[in-house]
Amino acid sequence: MMNFFTSKSSNQDTGFSSQHQHPNGQNNGNNNSSTAGNDNGYPCKLVSSGPCASSNNGALFTNFTLQTATPTTAISQDLYAMGTTGITSENALFQMKSMNNGISSVNNNNSNTPTIITTSQEETNAGNVHGDTGGNSLQNSEDDNFSSSSTTKCLLSSTSSLSINQREAAAAAYGPDTDIPRGKLEVTIIEARDLVTRSKDSQPYVVCTFESSEFISNGPESLGAINNNNNNNNNNQHNQNQHINNNNENTNPDAASQHHNNNSGWNGSQLPSIKEHLKKKPLYTHRSSSQLDQLNSCSSVTDPSKRSSNSSSGSSNGPKNDSSHPIWHHKTTFDVLGSHSELDISVYDAAHDHMFLGQVRLYPMIHNLAHASQHQWHSLKPRVIDEVVSGDILIKWTYKQTKKRHYGPQDFEVLRLLGKGTFGQVYQVKKKDTQRIYAMKVLSKKVIVKKNEIAHTIGERNILVTTASKSSPFIVGLKFSFQTPTDLYLVTDYMSGGELFWHLQKEGRFSEDRAKFYIAELVLALEHLHDNDIVYRDLKPENILLDANGNIALCDFGLSKADLKDRTNTFCGTTEYLAPELLLDETGYTKMVDFWSLGVLIFEMCCGWSPFFAENNQKMYQKIAFGKVKFPRDVLSQEGRSFVKGLLNRNPKHRLGAIDDGRELRAHPFFADIDWEALKQKKIPPPFKPHLVSETDTSNFDPEFTTASTSYMNKHQPMMTATPLSPAMQAKFAGFTFVDESAIDEHVNNNRKFLQNSYFMEPGSFIPGNPNLPPDEDVIDDDGDEDINDGFNQEKNMNNSHSQMDFDGDQHMDDEFVSGRFEI
């Protein structure tokens, strides 16, 4: 399904994949899987390879492949969060020879390790607890904690009081980004009070996100009944229990809840499964520029009587419903790889279709601190104005620096297989020291060398490094990368909501409002890439992931190209989403190919099928180059149709976005009701929240992969087949490794069954299943909307053409351009 694995040919950034699968399991014959394979997303429904010619001469990723010192975490190309290998171009070969001969290279490993500043801190203010029944607890905590006498500061601020620009200014005040925090952030969700719940049977749980890593709590350990009169007593009790010195924080938090009766029905188990009829919301087919913030109506109390009842209960002196006072004591640990990152804590009700109960956003400033902690009540906030939210949540966080510099496969426990592809596999893994869940892609060096894809593989990693260093909220982040003599490893955020393809396949199509939300976030992601001179080139549902809250994250940069200042000629992509200029224009194409794919994607989301789908690739290319787009009645609003037509203009110079890139798309009337700043900060409630029972939930991924056994991955067995590559070949991967290369030999025996278990899956093209489409007679042919300046609509291009493509066997795609057009 997902294209997490890409296989490209020799010295071109090429690829061509058609990875959709018909819901009934039928193969439509579109066997032109671009750069073959699926090595770059999570699950992979298809893997097929075929080399493609290109007019590029191999001068790819020059700024990246010449990098000589490699960071252990994806912070930037020259700012290191966990130390470097320090491999230089002059001694790379010697280093690799030493590695294979078991010779230590400690000196080189430490040559470029950045200095860690560990300024000591007066711990008196770090562990203070501020109890406040009103909404001023956060401000009070800031006033109390900000001590001018401390040599370092720990500042906690709320979203409402600190804008993005202000946060950036505050970050600059704390020093340059060369002092990136390296440590662990332990977060304990203790309890909440005065929640607005629908009934005493409500089952609150928490989704906690930090640097795109997710934690999904179980249900409460117990539910307590409290009086408002006792709030101050509770605050005093927490103040008495505060930990002023970090060295004394060994108290077991679970003991504090032993006196509560466990009447919640949770019994310490995972979240209960939701009945099937609660998972599906009615599909409506037409809404013109409606407010997205009204989509949360199912996530708030809509009955006025219930609202008044719940609101009044918040100020009464009587006892609360048990469900309004959940006690969790759930603890999780996050890897701190960046600086000034946001800690997002959202509360939901599993018993009422994951109703939203409130949110807290914190910005723990831990710059240059060896230790820091805080133990405090925070007022829950709504995401939008009309959400009914009240109550407070008690949160404790503790930050500690770590000394570890190098990571390898032994630091991760494999949990589930998420996908397979040409180069290797993608696994759900758990980092052993923090228990954090990640996705780990394992690529076989032998296959990469055989397909001559070393430069592209390193280029993909460096694009991920670039996007991580200039973070976008809607792009999957790279956390770690390292290598052994046999394999390459990329460790990224695990998005538990699964891929958008999986949800689209199950539901058939989305409402216009839901599609608009996803497209708007994709516009921000593509704008971020284009502003950094990166063309994505493989936009499709398989490469779009959902997080636990329902926001999207773009993944799979296997076909992306960096440093694109003008045009490129590489023939790559997925058939249904290819732009016509990629087929027809011998002068190459620009970043506008991404916006064409975006137009195809929104059409597919709303209508339920691809606008250019055909039973074979030759007909599909003809439709892309010359076919008319047909809209079913009452599926897209007039603004939506105008937006799609603007994106599907065959002349890239007149396509929507050609003048001002993503900013031009954001100004379109289709997005008139979007608050872009709020969307960028993820303040707009997603129209759909994935149903999850834990942070390790894989129910939104293909069970064909997730049910496969991975027990052999965690066993250290002798090497069965392949031997390490020669030192000369190993040296070619010097720009990839993040692990201490003197320790690579000890990992050589861990991962040799990957190639044995790899396989090629049958390719196909996906049409969402049974979306209750309108009858044929309701299809509208928009004949009058052709662009008179569109020079690509000339049917004469079809004259005297003959096929130059082989549609059998390995699906080789010949991208020879003849007389300004692709031979169809």
Swiss-Prot record:
All residue ranges annotated as the Protein kinase domain in the record: 412-671
GO BP field: cellular response to oxidative stress; intracellular signal transduction; positive regulation of hydrogen sulfide biosynthetic process; positive regulation of ribosomal protein gene transcription by RNA polymerase II; positive regulation of transcription by RNA polymerase I; positive regulation of transcription by RNA polymerase III; regulation of cell size; regulation of cysteine metabolic process
Keyword Repeat attached: no
Domain C2, residue spans: 166-378
Stretch list, region Disordered: 1-37, 125-152, 221-272, 285-327
Amino acids binding ATP: 418-426, 441
Nucleotide-binding as UniProt keyword: yes
InterPro entries, alphabetized: AGC-kinase_C, C2_dom, C2_domain_sf, Kinase-like_dom_sf, Pkinase_C, Prot_kinase_dom, Protein_kinase_ATP_BS, Ser/Thr_kinase_AS
A GO term for molecular function: ATP binding
Active site: 538
One of the Pfam families matching this protein, by short name: Pkinase
Chain positions with Phosphoserine modification: 711, 726, 758, 765
Family: Belongs to the protein kinase superfamily. AGC Ser/Thr protein kinase family. cAMP subfamily.
Role of this protein: Protein kinase that is part of growth control pathway which is at least partially redundant with the cAMP pathway. Regulates both BCY1 phosphorylation and MPK1 activity. Regulates ribosome biogenesis, translation initiation, and entry into stationary phase in a TORC1-dependent manner.
Protein name in the entry: Serine/threonine-protein kinase SCH9
